[in-house]
Every structure is written in structure tokens, then in C-alpha cells.
Amino acid sequence: MLIILAPSKKQTYPNCPNLVSTCPEFLQEAGQLNQILRAKTEKEIALLMKTSKILTENTLRDIRAFNGSEGRGFPAIFTFKGDAYDGIKAEDWNQEQMFYAQQHLRILSGLYGILRPLDLMQKHRLEMGLKLATHSGTQMYQFWGEKITDTINRQLDKGERCLINLSSTEYSRVIQKKKLDGRMIDIIFRQIKDGRARTIPIYAKRARGAMANFMVQEKIRDSEKLKNFSSEGYRFLPGESSEDSWVFSCTLNKK
């Protein structure tokens, strides 16, 4: 079983525990993409990424600072910040939980393709949904689709052949479902506010991180046990779920 998360635009170089780090599987491909970006002007980067002047300057700085050698950067699970990652308490994981995460948790990435928690990464801004011309086509999905799907298929060999999708639509689209050699379960979080149930993005992101953290803490290997997730008041709704789309909801407290 594997769990997939989307990355975060917010990234910081953290103070990390003394852990043995690993190298991204597609470091060479990350270097190729960075070279494509490096050849672009500031104006082209701004148009491609729809960024402000300051964000464009920061992005260019990261592109120019990128080093494709092994051993560069910081572990992904500690580098990504933001709503989803606020719920991931990797600094509190014990050795067994970190080992589980390294085996079962994956972070999709526009630059690196797919990352394990302890894979070293450098700060970057490259979203999966961008239209970036490469030798594979005009979209990032064409560049990464087969590579990521093949990697997931290979890593699903251990235990239940099930992919738990805690990612966003933009990132999970990269997976070629027809070629996926296993079951993919989409996790949907809804929030009840003013008597109406709907998905509010900021709360959904936080819930994805909290569920990923729950899976690591409990070292879950049976997807059925996910239905016990109850953080922040969420509960599984069997009547609104299907075999491959599981719905959880919570009621937001009035303020």
C-alpha cells in the first residue's frame, strides 16, 4: 500500500533530525527540467508560472542555485510546509514510524516526479499542471505520467496493492489509472458549515495531512482501517462512499 500527497509551494530549509537521507529516484530528470527552466527569461518564467515580480525573482534564484548532484538539499518531509504539512508531525515519529513512512508515503512533485519522505530535495517552484515543453510533449503530465505510474506499480508489490490518494486533482491526474496495477482509493473530505456539506479547500488540505500522519503513526497496512480516522471530528460516511471513493465529513465549529 502507498499513500500519495501533493507537494506544497511553501518550502523552507529546516533544522532536521539526524537521519539517514536518500536520493530521489528521478534526480537526473529533475536536472533536465531545471535546465529547461534555466534557459528561460524572467518574463517567460513569470508568464509560465503566473507569478508576481518578487515570486519570479525568488523562483529564478532557486533555478540558478539548483545542483543536480547527489547529497544536495534537505529531506522532503521536513522541507514542505503549508496547510497539509501542518498536520504531519514527522518530528514526532519514532524510528519504526519513519521507516513505515519511507516505505509507504510518497509526495508527488513537478520537479522530482515522486519523493520519499527522506529524499533530499532543493527549493523549487514547478507545478504539475503547467504546460512546459519537453522532449515528451507540451505538458508535465506527458513527461511524468509513465515514469511515476511505473514507479508506483513497482513499489505496490509489498502488501496490499492499494494506492491511497490524499493528493490534489492537479497532481493525482499524473497517474495513468489504466496502467495502474492496483486499486486507487480517492479520499474526499467534506465540511458541514451552516447546515451545508461541501469541500472547503483549506480544511481538506489539513485533513489530508492529518490522515497521512494517522496512517504513519498507526503504521496502517490494511486500507479498511483508514475508516477509523477521527481526527478533528471527521467520520467515515459509508452511505456517501463508493468502493474507490471514500467520503469523510466533519462539522465546523461556529466562531
UniProtKB/Swiss-Prot annotation:
Organism superkingdom: Bacteria
Short name of one Pfam family: H2O2_YaaD
Transmembrane residue ranges: none
InterPro entries per record: YaaA
Cellular component GO terms held in the UniProt record: cytosol
GO biological process entries: response to hydroperoxide
Family, as annotated: Belongs to the UPF0246 family.
Name of the molecule in the record: UPF0246 protein DP0358
Species for this entry: Desulfotalea psychrophila (strain LSv54 / DSM 12343)
